[in-house]
Amino acid sequence: MIECRDVNARVGNFAIRAVTFVVPQGVHAALTGPTASGKTTLLELIAGAIAPRSGIVRVGGIDVTGRPPETRGIGFVPQHGYLFPHLNTSENVRYGARDPATVASLTRRFGIEHLMDRTVTKLSGGERQVVALCRSLAPRPDVVLLDEPFAALDADRRATVLNEFSALQVEWGFTVLHVTHDESDARSATLRLVMSDGSIT
Amino acid sequence: MRAAGHRSSRAHANAHAAAHAAAHAAANTTAWVLGALLLLFLAVPIILLVALGAGGVGNALRDPDTIAALETTFVTATGATLIAAICGSPIAYALSRASFRGRSVIAAIVDLPLLIPHPVAGIAILLLVSRDTAFGSALLDMGFRVVGTPAGIIAAMLFVSAPLYISAAREAFARVDRRFEFVARTLGDTPWAAFRRVTLPLARRGLASAAIVTWARAVSEFGAVVVLAYNPKVVSVLSYDRFTTGGLGQALPIAATLVLVSIVPLIALRALKYDRNSEVVS
């Protein structure tokens, strides 16, 4: 479960205003809205990169507002993946993993086994995003935050990855907040949040 | 009549444009000449020194005094660089990341040694470690002498070179996108673990080049060192000593040796820099 209650924040000239919403446990929510409406900022706030000025952020029913990111049980896939360039694919996916079996199953299911020994800077944009997705899932998070994770995938690959992701969500039961500009991505979600000018509308 | 006037005004405009272009070209040439003169002034004395002194380097390297001075210089410069890196990296990191209270005070303290003459820096350190201060007399009571020892040389080198390390390391850390650290945190890393596993490896080339600049600066330090420790002699002090006692001919081989020694790290630094430009960090 992800819950924001009357959250206000300011990053530079940019503000998040009185954001209140709940994504129930195990639900896949899409977060849409125009560019620069605060979607990425909201994800970073939930994940703990930014502290709100006021309001409460709860993850799995626990108030995490003042807590450091590593204790929130959140998997985060930033836009463009941000794979660690000094590590290879396998080291990236294993980075936060607790057991090798999870890593093996993720890489098999998302079809990236053949990339494991590769330098991540040599991967295609789409491959990087899938690797970043697997890396965020490897620690078995309770909540997964996705920032346009499938933008660089072609339509076929996108459908396969999204199907696999949805199947995994049913099995593991994590909650998803998914920033997207893609209408078909948004339709695959069971809850839809729209953001505009720093507020959920 | 009107057509003629039109033509003449166009001719006027053309002449104006040509004059403008000529002035521009002249300014350009002047700028190049001035820049080239400065470059020559920077490079020629050093080239001359190496060209004229190189023949004596072989002999200098058989002179026990020179060997001892080289050893002292390398050991103390390496010590100063290690201290600067170990104590300076946290400061550099903090300056590159957070905006916090006292940040500008720290930045000013770090810049301070760059602004004062090096002998003055030496005198200031001398004051600190003299038996007149509580700190200096405590050191002496513990049997730790600074003046006239390798410790004094390291102190002098550290004072003048640590600011270079901190400013270069700060740039190296600033080039690492903070989002990498944040992603590492969401994967379970504490701030220290994220620094060690992600930031440090991504900044390593910049940190290595910072250490090389620091080392080269420490090797070439004279003013602060000579105040704190005329003996044991570092290479710069030895070359000055030979110059005052035996003149240019005596000083030249040692000076050339020092230049050759300080050129090596600079070439290594350039190599690292070119490498880094092709590296993807974001």
Model-inferred region functions:
Chain B
Residues 34-37, 44, 76-81, 92, ...:
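Alpha-helical transmembrane segments of multi-pass integral membrane proteins
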Residues 59, 79-110, 123, 127, ...:
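Transmembrane-helix boundary motif in ABC transporter permease subunits
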Residues 4-5, 67, 122-158, 192, ...:
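Membrane-interfacial helix termini and adjacent extracytoplasmic/periplasmic loops
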